[in-house]
Amino acid sequence: LVYLEAGYPYAFDNGTGPTMKEFQDLKNLAPKAPPPSESDPGLASFAALQQAGLRALGFTYPEGELRQRFTTTPDERVGKERDFPGDATMLEGMKKYADIPVPALAIFAIPHDQGKWVHDSTGPKVREAAKAYSAADLALTTRQAKVFEEGVPTAHVVRLRGADHYVYLSNEADVLRELKSFLSTLR
C-alpha cells in the first residue's frame, strides 16, 4: 500500500491519533488567497490557470484536476469552483482501518507548504494566519504520522518538510525515490 499524503484518520484510525474533525478545523486556520476577479487573465483558459498556479505555488496541477474543480463557461473560460460534497459526506459510514497488516509506504507533508503567494505576502493578517496554521499543521500532522508509524509496524513513514498536499507534484523526485526504495523491499 502507498499513501501519498493520505495516511490521515480516514485511512488509519486506531483511536490514539487526531480526528478528521481536527484536520477539518485546521483548514479554517489557513490563510485564504483572495479570489480572482472574473476578468483575471488566469481564468482565460485552463492552460492560463495552470500557469497562474505555477506562479502561485511553484508547480502546476494537471488540467484534468482543474477541470474537476472548476466549471467551464460557454466561452471556454474557467468558471466557478464546483461545490464539493465535503469531507463529512464523503467520510460518512467509511470503515475505520485500525490494522494494516501489509507493507506500506506513507508520505506526509509536514508541515504543508502554503504556497508562494503566502511566502511572498507582506500583509500582517496573512503572515499571522500562516504562522498559526503552520504551527497547528506541524503539531497535528506530526501526531498523525507518529500514530501511523507506531500503529502500522509494516509501514515506512516519510516526512517531507514543506511539501504540498499534492506531494507527487511538489516533490516528484522525493516521491519517486521513496517509491523505488519501498518497492525494492518487496522483492
Model-derived regions: residue spans:
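Short beta-strand segments
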Residues: 3-4, 105-109, 159
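Charge-rich, low-complexity amphipathic helices
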Residues: 13, 20, 24, 170-171, ...
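Active-site nucleophile loop of the alpha/beta-hydrolase fold
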Residues: 2-12
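A general structural signal marking secondary-structure boundaries and capping sites
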Residues: 10, 14, 30, 186-187
